[in-house]
Curated annotation (Swiss-Prot):
Membrane topology, from the record: Single-pass membrane protein
Name of the protein in its database record: Sec-independent protein translocase protein TatA
Keyword Transferase: no
Sample GO molecular function, one term: protein transmembrane transporter activity
Organism: Mesorhizobium japonicum (strain LMG 29417 / CECT 9101 / MAFF 303099) (Mesorhizobium loti (strain MAFF 303099))
Main localization, broad class: membrane
Subunit structure: The Tat system comprises two distinct complexes: a TatABC complex, containing multiple copies of TatA, TatB and TatC subunits, and a separate TatA complex, containing only TatA subunits. Substrates initially bind to the TatABC complex, which probably triggers association of the separate TatA complex to form the active translocon.
GO cellular component annotations of the record: TAT protein transport complex
Record carries keyword Protein transport: yes
Keywords annotated in UniProt: Cell inner membrane, Cell membrane, Membrane, Protein transport, Translocation, Transmembrane, Transmembrane helix, Transport
Disulfide-bonded cysteines: none
Family of this protein: Belongs to the TatA/E family.
Amino acid sequence: MGSFSIWHWMIVLVIVLLVFGRGKIPELMGDMAKGIKSFKKGMADDDVADDKRTVEHRADETVSAVKEKASKS
């Protein structure tokens, strides 16, 4: 009773086809694929930008730490 049979899924499929039509479903799937691709590209771009900022920040900290030690001596 808690699980869906094949007939439940067939009825859902028929209702979806009636609501959206045959031409609209591929268009929606294409738009969803473009959105996922754009999201992945954005995440990859953020990772590269974050890596560059982290490396530059650590280099600055090292230089300032060395200068402070040199000025104290």
